[in-house]
From Swiss-Prot:
Originating species: Homo sapiens (Human)
Compartments, record wording: Cell junction, Focal adhesion; Cell junction, Adherens junction; Cell membrane; Endoplasmic reticulum membrane
Lineage of producing organism: Eukaryota, Metazoa, Chordata, Craniata, Vertebrata
Annotated motif LYPX(n)L motif 2, positions: 45-49
Sequence ranges assigned to domain PDZ in this UniProt record: 114-193, 198-273
One GO process term, biological-process aspect: positive regulation of phosphorylation
Primary subcellular site in the record, as a coarse category: other
Protein's UniProt name: Syntenin-1
Coiled-coil regions, chain positions: none
Modified residues (N-acetylserine): 2
Motif LYPX(n)L motif 3 mapped to chain: 49-53
Residue numbers of Phosphotyrosine PTMs: 46
Amino acid sequence: MSLYPSLEDLKVDKVIQAQTAFSANPANPAILSEASAPIPHDGNLYPRLYPELSQYMGLSLNEEEIRANVAVVSGAPLQGQLVARPSSINYMVAPVTGNDVGIRRAEIKQGIREVILCKDQDGKIGLRLKSIDNGIFVQLVQANSPASLVGLRFGDQVLQINGENCAGWSSDKAHKVLKQAFGEKITMTIRDRPFERTITMHKDSTGHVGFIFKNGKITSIVKDSSAARNGLLTEHNICEINGQNVIGLKDSQIADILSTSGTVVTITIMPAFIFEHIIKRMAPSIMKSLMDHTIPEV
């Protein structure tokens, strides 16, 4: 079973498979149209086979983008058929999205990882933690801090600190353990952002993906937009855009990041009631001035 980063990728892949199967079947009658011509052997499939994809589902795709995101699998044809399959991102089929860097920056990894960090010259690691439902979660990661440098992010769950299980700890106890820890080596076991998920969308010809937000929270979804097709929900807060943290930024700044993004936009969202609980008692000015808003490297 194939997985896709967006509904647009799924739909376009189905069109590709149907066209390829039709063209490769010698039993099909010949139709004098460019769209159903035999598959060329030079790998240049899309300008002739799929001209309709350029405006499919409201997408704005040019031939170069389509060709760049499609890989023709080499090797002997099976039963006389040529095999044409889109490129994959993390085992996902993505004929429209392609190898988009925003998806890789925003990826929420399943499983648990271990990070090792040290305190800075002021004896700090640039991290604030919050206790939620007997678990400890990252509330704030400061820019250019040790916590930022090892890749910790807002919403990460801290399972262990220096081998001690954090389950049942209060926020104060977690901060106390970090404060008392030896400064040259602190080992933390992390579960990657369990309350968050990513949604990949595609801009239409006007440069929009189709949602409205206020104070960083999604309030409306535009009918028949990419946001609607891909299941974006209201009452969710935007945590990241293409992997870049936007928590604490003004709506105008978030809008600028969206508008300057490419045609593929991946946002990371969290249910509003959980988001509000995590940031509770943290001043907006702190989130704006201290939160790490840099673009992560991949």
